[in-house]
Every structure is written in C-alpha cells, then in structure tokens.
Amino acid sequence: MTVSPVALRRKTECKPHPTARYWKKCDVEALFGLPFLDLIYQAAEIHRQNFNPREIQLSTLLSIKTGGCPEDCAYCPQSAHHNTNLGKEQMMDVDEIVEKAKIAKSRGASRFCMGAAWRGPKPKDVETVSAIIKAVKGLGMETCGTFGMLEEGMAEDLKEAGLDYYNHNLDTDPDRYNDIIHTRRHEDRMDTLGKVRNAGLKVCCGGIVGMNETRAERAGLIASLANLDPQPESVPINRLVKVEGTPLDDAEDLDWTEFVRTIAVARITMPQSYVRLSAGRSNMPEAMQAMCFMAGANSIFYGDKLLTTGNPDEDGDRILMEKLNLYPLQFELEGEVAEVEKASGIKVDY
C-alpha cells in the first residue's frame, strides 16, 4: 500500500498501537505547561514501560560530503548562502568512510550515520552511497543516511543496498517553517518521508529547538512528529548550536529546563520511539544530560564531532555513563557483558 504525505499525519481513527493518538498542538502545549517535576515523573514512567532505562543506543555521525549546500536553512553552517568559512568539500573516499565506521564500532557504536550536504542526491550519488552502505553493513552495523530530498525509486535503491534508517528532520513547527527555510517547504519534507516509508525504511525524524521559537511552536514541532503515521523509530532532538555567519548566530539561549521539557514531552507523545540527544550536547552540563535521560532520552551521538559541530569526547561520555550506571544497547541485547566493557570502556554493573 502506498503511503501519501497526507496519510503520514496520523488521523484519530488510525492507531498502529494502543498508545497511538492524534495530538492536538494545544494538548502538547498543555504537557509543556505541567509542573516540571510532575512532567519528568510522567515521562520517566512511560519510558520505563517501553524501554530498559539503563540502555543507551549509541550512534556515530559522519559528514561524508561537507559544505556548499544550496539550501538556506538559517541554522546550518553548511549552507552556501551563509558566510561561515566552511568550504565545499568533495565526497570522502569509500575506504576512508569504512575505516571511520570500523573505528566507531570498535568504540561501542551500534549505528553508523552518514550525512551529505545536498538538497537531494543525483542518481550517480545514490549509486555511490549504496556502495558505502553495503560496505558498512558488512561490518555488522546498522546504517542511517541523511541525503536530502529523494526522487522516486531512490529510497528503494537505498533499502536494497542495506540502509536501515533514513534521517529527514521536520526542523521546526510547520507554521513557522518558512521563517527558518525558504528554499523548500514543509510539504517537501513530508513527501520524502512518504517515499521512505513506502520503501520499508525506518524513519529518523526530529527537529531543532532554541531557534527563537515560542513554547507553543515547540509544541507544534513535537505534535507534527508525534502525528506521523507510524511514529518515527528514532527522534533526534537538537539544541541549536549557534555558528557565526548564520542568521541564527545571535539567537537567545534556550533555558535548560525548557530543553528537558522538550525531551519529556517527546517521550510522552512518542512512547516507543528512541529519543536522541543530538546537536548541542557539548554545551550541556552532566546534570542536565542526566535529567534528559531521566525524562526519556535513550540515544546519543557518540564521537567528538557531529557533521561540522562539536560533540562531547568519548572519554567524557564513558565517564558520564559510568556515573549514571548506563550502558550501550547493542551488546546487552547480545548478552555480551564483556564486550560492552571491552568496546566502550564502560563498566557494566547489573
């Protein structure tokens, strides 16, 4: 059955699992308005009903083609429209990418995510990334790609190559989408998400907060994600990383409690999705990250770089996970406790 972009917005009568519902923006905003500790408590309860709260899924993200993107996203240093001193680079060599994936796996990552600064790939680009996907899959890792808007048949080609997840974020509240991006529409994102679902790929879809949006607009973003049908398997929540030269480099800092609220509301509205702490984590104190894990975050990017912005170094993440008695998801599922400690350096205490 073909899934149209309209059908991706969950209707009240469409319930793929018992917890599914249509989320009105006002109802999501009401969740944001709950007393902080009550909200965290509710989110933690829902998290524990669906996941082991001590397991954290580790992904590593690599930019395989950096800079020169024709899109004008106000938050992105890779846009050719912004003067960020980030030059356009050619696509990385396949062997170099595979070597990066090997290193990521050896350090405990279970998923290797690859991003390319395109509006959308050309057919020859799909051939190239398909070869890369096959090579990474050969290492025994999950694969995720973020390559922009897809034409007909491209998602099927990526699926055939072995791609597991396709990342395509909704970025912000649909009602303010054109305030942030002028070179594409919210409907264009929905169209590609429909192609991805029709091809049988898993969906990684989230957004960015801290772009001068209101709480109501944050609620609009979460509602638009929660009403995708089915809900995304993976939901990355990014905290804006301000980069000089981008239109948002002077954005007002988002209060840390508001970010934690966003994580909690994402968990409540998308109970079976992996909620990932994504960009902006390098500026988050350990206590703030701990609150995010308590509120339902159960995935992080592992490695010292996210596309072009910084990320906590692996040693710091190991120390934090040990302090919080958290461990990587991958090896626990295989029952290999010794492998957890060997690959990630994190001591597992059951």
UniProtKB/Swiss-Prot annotation:
Family according to the record: Belongs to the radical SAM superfamily. Biotin synthase family.
This protein's encoding gene: bioB
Binding site for [2Fe-2S] cluster: C113, C144, C204, R276
Full protein name: Biotin synthase
Pathway as given in its UniProt record: Cofactor biosynthesis; biotin biosynthesis; biotin from 7,8-diaminononanoate: step 2/2
Task performed by this protein: Catalyzes the conversion of dethiobiotin (DTB) to biotin by the insertion of a sulfur atom into dethiobiotin via a radical-based mechanism.
GO biological process: biotin biosynthetic process
Keywords: 2Fe-2S, 4Fe-4S, Biotin biosynthesis, Iron, Iron-sulfur, Metal-binding, S-adenosyl-L-methionine, Transferase
InterPro entries: Aldolase_TIM (IPR013785), BATS_dom (IPR010722), Biotin_synth/BioAB (IPR002684), Biotin_synthase (IPR024177), Elp3/MiaA/NifB-like_rSAM (IPR006638), rSAM (IPR007197)
